[in-house]
Amino acid sequence: MHFLFFFANRQFLSLKCPQAEFVWIPHPVHGYITGKFIQEDYGGTSYCQTEEGESLSVACAPSQLAKVAKSVLDKSVDDLVQMDDINEAMIVHNLRKRFKNDQIYTNIGTILISVNPFKRLPLYTPTVMDQYMHKVPKEMPPHTYNIADDAYRAMIDNRMNQSILISGESGAGKTECTKQCLTYFAELAGSTNGVEQNILLANPILESFGNAKTLRNNSSRFGKWVEIHFDQKGSICGASTINHLLEKSRVVYQIKGERNFRIVATELVKAPPRSRGGGGSSPARPESFKFLSQSGCIDVEGVDDVKEFEERVLCHGQARVRVQFSEDDINNCMELISAILHLGNFEFVSGQGKNVETSTVANREEVKIVATLLKVDPATLEQNVTSKLMEIKGCDPTRIPLTPVQATDATNALAKAIYSKLFDWLVKKINESMEPQKGAKTTTIGVLDIFGFEIFDKNSFEQLCINFTNEKLQQHFNQYTFKLEEKLYQSEEVKYEHITFIDNQPVLDLIEKKQPQGLMLVLDEQISIPKSSDATFFIKANQTQAARSTQLRGGEDSRTDFIIKHYAGDVIYDSTGMLEKNKDTLQKDLLVLSESSKQKLMKLLFPPSEGDQKTSKVTLGGQFRKQLDSLMTALNATEPHYIRCIKPNSEKQADLFHGFMSLQQLRYAGVFEAVRIRQTGYPFRYSHENFLKRYGFLVKDIHKRYGPNLKQNCDLLLKSMKGDCXSKVQVGKTRVLYRAPEQRGLELQRNIAVERVTIQIQAGVRRMFARRLYKRMRAIKPVLLNAIKSRSLSVLEQAIDAAKDIEFDMKLIRDCKELRSVILKEMEITKKLTDYIGAPPNHKTYLQVEPLYAQLCAVLTEAESINYSTPLVETGQQIKYMIAQRVETREQLKQAVDGAVRVDLEAAIARAEQIGLEESEPTLAAGRQELQRIYREEELVAELLNALAVGMAMRTSETTWDHAAIDAHTLGSAIYAAESFGFRTEQGRLTLDEAKVIVEVRQHLAADDYESLSMTLKKATTTLNKNSMSQSTKTEIDEAYEELSHNTAVNDLIEKVVQAIQDHDQEMLDYGVQQADSLRITDRPEMMQATELLNRIVNARALLREGITNVDQAQLETALADAASFAYTREEVPTAQQLLDRIYVINHDADVGLYYMEKEPLERAWAGAQEINLKTAQIDEVRNVLANDEQKFIQEQLKTANRLGDQARAIRLNIKLKEIFFGQFGKMFVFEQFGGLRKPEDFAKAKLLGREALKLGMFKWTKSPIPTSLTTLDQLAVKSATRLFKNVLGFMGDRPLPYPNALAQDLLEQCLAAPELRNEVYCQIIKQLTENPSPQSVTKGWQLMRCCLQTFPPSEEFANCLEMFLAAKGKDDKYIEMLHDTQYGDKRTSAPNVEQILAAKQYVTRIDLNQSTQVDTSVVPQGFVPEKLIADDTEGVIRAGSRPAQARAQPGQQAQPAGAARQQAAAPVQAAAATASYDYGQQQQQQQQGYDQQQQAYGGGADYGQQQQQQDLPAEPTEEYKQVEVVYDYDGGGDAQRLVLVKGAIITVIKEYEGWAYGSTDDGQVGLYPINYTRPI
């Protein structure tokens, strides 16, 4: 491809270019590219070839092509002044290279170049901000924070107002730079009243009303000058905003592809009805409004308008409260915007009056809507928009009708006026909320964010004003950077190199000069001339500016267009409509109508005016120039700092750098000249006096050698300084000037000296505070000692109150408080005892005190708990003892009477007599009476037993009985006597029951009534206790049974055997033969015949019966084989076969279930075995496994998973065990009691003021940064923790910071890189979710929790507390699933994308707890029974969050305590832990117990952490333990429950296990340790 490129800057193309050397070739897209010169033609055109082989032609001689220094192409320089090879091409190349590396900021000395990346970069997090605040700015990369910091430091050091001028074309990123500067100031110099938050929170509201979507970007359509006020301490104390040139014409007209202001275009139409105020009837579709639909652009791609409205206007409650916007203000504001929209819908139709054209409103319903919203008369409104009142001096006012076009203009003017005044009111309202205190002495930093240079297809009055503003700012930059620079060097008589720059003063004269009239003045003049028009303006402008043909010339349309040569390029302006846009006057009668409105906000916007104010004409151009002059005056009174924003491409595309487009912006911004002047000039300068003040102290005692001449003093100081940094410093007539290298050297020396002095000052202040505290402690010590010695409550109270300001935790203060508590308790006990037993010596008797026995016991227990003993307490103990004896004796008597036991009753009566219980006592009288009754009952029992011993039937042979000897009458008489008396003793009742049964048996036998006898004997079986029967009763019942059985059996057997012989019923035959033998009837013919038949099949039947009865697999197989040998096919054979098949299935299920330890096959096997009564060793094991509770069963599954190497299953089971454990002991893991947290007192001490509030709110939501970390961290990590908390605040919206997702991303990346911060961040999120009053903040907090849970796990120690918090507060179980996935899944090495996490609608867990185990039956051995695992080597129980167990370790290695050792250790360890925990808080003991229980839940015994010994521990056990010496160092493997061993230490052994032991060290630490690291002493 060949093309001709004309390059204008010939000054750059000045280096001689030999042939075949690499040169910079001008390029229309990339600016410059590298290539080689090929040849030159006769016309002076050079032909080159790029490195990619592309041919290019350049209209210049070869000598004008700059040579490429290839050695520096790979360098990336962050300060263009420091470049070795400086030219346009190298500067553009350097910016492009840095842009590709996301290094969007580059310095030109103190000027910052900012290239818009069109994407989010992690450059604005609190961590980055903190680095710029706490490090030397020159050591940090270029950044907006550097500029802001320079401005702030200069304001503090010089006490001079500063300004930051942010310039660049539209879309270059000026507004973002402004936000970053304001955010930095808010963080660096935060106020006590939170005004800095007002500044940040007000910004979105201003953007809603002042930003709009343009063809290029979504940009500010107004300029703002934000002045931040600082008090004498450097803290923000107020702020103000001045708005410039709101583009109010956008309200009524937008060019194609652009939108109305954001609040108008989206936030009203798409807001819920409650935000529309009186405009609730507004159509919901934006197409219904002309002011929204005329440009054809309603929606913006990638922007959620409804969400934006909710966030910026409705839901940002914090912003509305801070800037003092009420709900009425919002509703009134929405009413006015709705009225503006409906004004745009007025449709005017033409009519004919008396020789004039008239107009009327076609859609009068719109007039009614607007009138309702504005609270004005509809008829008056319609009249005033269709006609105007003409007032001529000396004549009556006349109403003149308006044409449809004029009526539309009048309506548009009203809409613009309302919106413009509404915006001014908004700014005023915001300023009032941030106004500094009256009379306060302040310094300011102003930040200017104003519209960038604009060149559109159609440019009108708005673009002329905007570009005029940019010309002014460019002139300010030129004056400060170039003109004033050279002027200063000349006045100071310093050598310098002259720099040529683009001077835009002629363009400013063209626009604003008075003679000849500039374009703005011509516009103003034409407004006051009758019958003037855009055409007359165009003619007059060309006439007055004919002499400035270089800056102004005609356009393509010579009747309307003119071209101005701006510093940023030629702009074609269309004069059509300029006159009307410049008028900015509202028709008088519309103004009067507006002033008559009853709408609250309209009354404020249009207050009643007086006199000629109603008719005064103030042009928009005139207002604008006045504002601009005021702005320039303010800027000129400040020390400026510059940020030049560059737009790298017009497509707003990330990672796309158009070199030529950027090159043009750099040229117009004066960047290249700034680079050269910074290199050749002296950017750093001080007056002689200030130079001496700033650096004079670097040379000791130099002031003693000073003379009256300040210049000579400066020379003397520079010559006396060490090093060569002062050799190139220029001392001018009034100033000292020098370049960047000298500045760095001087500042380095000064910083070192200041730091040294600062350290000395800090040490002195700390020493002073320490001495003051020591004096207060010494002064309070005797007071505390006397108070303790006095044991006087009032004295103690006074001493404690006197010591309340002592910050140090003195033991004497603790002792006083403890003694006060003891004395208060003693007083309480004494008062209660006096109430109960009376004051000495008039004590009550124990009979009087007995009703208060329970209360007396309680108060004496309290006295015992504090070892409180006095005569009164001892008397109470004696009375308590006496009462207790009486109470116990009464209860003993009552129980003995109720039980009717003679021995107990006699003992109770004896005790009552011993303690002197009164005979009138009811329980004693009842006892004596019952004892007499028992004596009589025993006599009757003896008579009854005698009657039972005689009168039973006599056996005459083995099969016959004699009934003649039966006697039932005597026994019946004895029964009658017993029932009449009423037996109560147990022996009496049992004997009576026996007698009743026996008398019935005798009666039935005597009558040969065997059926009744059978029923009586059955009843005896249920009513009589065989073990307590008398021997005679047992004998008589047995005999009756035998007689009954024999008689029944003989008859039944003969009948059945006869039938069995007929049917060849083998089972009945077998039964008959056996019964005949027992009945002694084997010699009867029927039985002999049956025996002969039975012998034929008895063997086969016996085998089958045995196999089926025993459910024995081997017996069944043998019996079936035997039956098959002689073809026996009765029902036993198929039954046996079915049973054998079932056994095969059950055994297979048992094999699979035990091998894989899966419940389903185990339950099938057990159910089948129960059903058929199968009993084997394997089935016993199945029963034992299933008999375990859920926890124990999962432990067995966990062992199996480790045996099979199924890590995924082991993790799932581990989680289930945790769930069980938390169900039992979860309450012990309270977040506030996590051991890694700081104590609230320590947390509060990190701040000098407000400590009590900090202590109480340590675990509650706050909108302020925290003074230190929530967890115990080293000092370096504490700083990171406090910075990360700002990320949390910013993401949750509790503190306005830009780019919340970037804050979350930064937090995730830092926590991945620094594991020690992970617990801290989780604690911070939990803190911010606790008692948070904002639902939006809570939602964002859980989003941040979700991001963290999917990125990094907490520590093992904190995981339980976090999981319990998620279970209690999380909306669902997904948070716990995320935690488990992160704990047990693959660890991340890089942070996930926050936006992707938040965009995910559903979380898919990686660990499915319900996932079934994959079973391979081919590997299962038959008859499998799991062996008991050897605990020290093979157990694989994985603890939650811990590493798998290792094999036993050799010395120097780490090993996991075996499960068996843990289980055996449980009891003694618990006892030792209880001793070590004495004097600890209750919660600590519960939490320790919880950890122990958790370890048992995971299949092991309790792992116990190190327990610190406390004062006044109980005495150690007297049992002697053996001791061992440590021979190898052991670090505990990172497990806090094990001892850390140091070679040579002595351990007292409490208990030994397989490979491990439990013991205590000399300093009181207790825990497990490996035996092979020690040797016996």
From Swiss-Prot:
PROSITE patterns: IQ, MYOSIN_MOTOR, MYTH4, SH3. Residues 1442-1466, 1483-1516 are annotated as: Disordered. Residues 628-650, 730-744 are annotated as: Actin-binding. The keyword rRNA-binding does not apply. Residues 1444-1466, 1483-1497 have a biased composition (Low complexity). Residues 75-751 form the Myosin motor domain. ATP binds at G168, E169, S170, G171, A172, G173, K174, T175. Residues 1261-1401 form the MyTH4 domain. Gene3D superfamilies: 1.10.10.820, 1.20.5.4820, 1.20.58.530, Kinesin motor domain, Myosin VI head, motor domain, U50 subdomain, MyTH4 domain, SH3 Domains. The modification N6,N6,N6-trimethyllysine is found at K119. Myosin I heavy chain is single-headed. Belongs to the TRAFAC class myosin-kinesin ATPase superfamily. Myosin family. This is High molecular weight form of myosin-1.
